[in-house]
Amino acid sequence: CYNEEENVREISAALIKQFQECLSEYDYEIVFIDNASTDKTRVYLREMCRENKKVKAIFNIRNFGQNNSPFYGLLQTTGYCSITMSCDFQDPVEMIPKFIKEWENGHTLVMAVKSSSKENKVKYFLRTTYYKLFRKMSTIEPIEHFTGFGLYDRSFVNILRDLNDPIPFMRGIIAEFGYNYSIIEFEQPPRKAGKTHNNIMTLYSIATVSYTHLTLPTNSRV
């Protein structure tokens, strides 16, 4: 997260409630990855960690971006499975029991794919165009409108640990190495509070990383 002072406490409370009410048979921990926030996000995270031992936080020394942070965050997890999501409520916590059900049924990956979105229409159009270009450029079949929100079994996280990729592109890695996966569609709600820090340049940066990933042979990254 980056400058999410209006959301971190609320998303933590929503996650705790979800586990208490729907997944009480599971143990869990909540790990926040902060990308050098300049508002009160870090202050609140430290307070939350002191208040609840199930809440953890990783404080990056600088903003490593929305590609690198989730990847390296997954590498720090130790559970039988891990779920990555944003803290602005655009990734609904209500999806988590659905992920767990698919995982219990034997799926290694469970991916949430946007069937529609209440985000800016221009950005949604650009994302759609990006996936069309992705498909033309690569022999790897992309998972359209998948942002990383989903469940990852420990066996797949171990695959990530074996990769030697300084600039990992999670969506490409999943398309290339993912197996036995399930897709669940959802309508992406609007951000609950605060403002997005993603802009056209962010999307351009992601597209550049994905192009680099696609043009490198697999054995040069492993």
Range-by-range predicted roles:
Residues 1-120:
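Structured catalytic core of nucleotide-sugar glycosyltransferases
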Residues 166, 172-189:
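Catalytic donor-sugar/metal-binding loop of nucleotide-sugar-dependent glycosyltransferases
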